[in-house]
Amino acid sequence: MTNNLRPGERLDDLQLGGLEFIQNPSKFCFGVDAVFLSDFAKVKPGETVLDMGTGNGIIPVLLAGKTKGKHFTGLEIQAETAEMARRSVAHNHLEDRISIVTGDIKEAAERFKPAFFDVITTNPPYMLADHGLRNPDDSKAIARHEVLCTLDDILRESMRLLQDKGRFYMIHRPFRLTEILTKMHEYKIEPKRIQFIHPYIDKEPTMVLVEGMRGAKPRVTIEPPIIMYAKDGTLLQKNGNNSEKQR
């Protein structure tokens, strides 16, 4: 059914148990980083999850399709984007498992109960507010640059909202990894697992996945890297296994 679509929107098949997703190409569409994050995050049966800066809600929808988590909450500051996310949730009849909340990450701990969530996920803006060229479209600038929230905001609120030994999952850019790990330790979210994502086996990583645990002891594992493409352009799965040819 497409009666939930607005002008300029499309309905995409997620290839995941019949789930479909509403997007607007002129605004912002989710990328492969969201898929990698949803694969990396470990959600156990019965757990509660908060996705900070959920955008159009892709992470909660993917996690609802991939895991047996009890409930997923997406927090999004842009009202129009949050409304689109709610329509995707309703389209897939996931209202009993996913809630989309319009609100500011910087005030997340005031909106939710302290130490309430088992898991927090985030695909935050990668660029500092003054780094590089901002996209003239505000919605894309907010998604890509730290215009409305910073790494400190995300980690501070996550520290307050995670249960003891609760898990934190984030995808980011490798050039900020030193800052990320330092700040995670400062906010008592100890880095536990790191995985780099390379476009090709002989190229530097372009993304990094990080798992942290609230109140844990220092000990980190480096996972085997994800290689996205073979040299001939063949699309690969995790750790270099062959997948279908890129089209």
Task: Tell where the protein language model's regions lie, with residue ranges.
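Conserved Class I SAM-dependent methyltransferase catalytic core
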Residues: 148-199, 203-205
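A generic structural signal for alpha->beta connector loops
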Residues: 18, 46, 69, 95-97, ...
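SAM/dcSAM-binding transferase cores
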Residues: 204-247
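A generic structural micro-feature
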Residues: 66-67, 113, 202-206, 220
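Class I SAM-dependent transferase core
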Residues: 2-45
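General small-molecule cofactor/ligand-binding pocket signal
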Residues: 22, 99-101, 192-195
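Mobile active-site "lid"/loop adjacent to the S-adenosyl-L-methionine
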Residues: 124-153
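Conserved SAM/SAH cofactor-binding pocket of Class I
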Residues: 40-133, 156
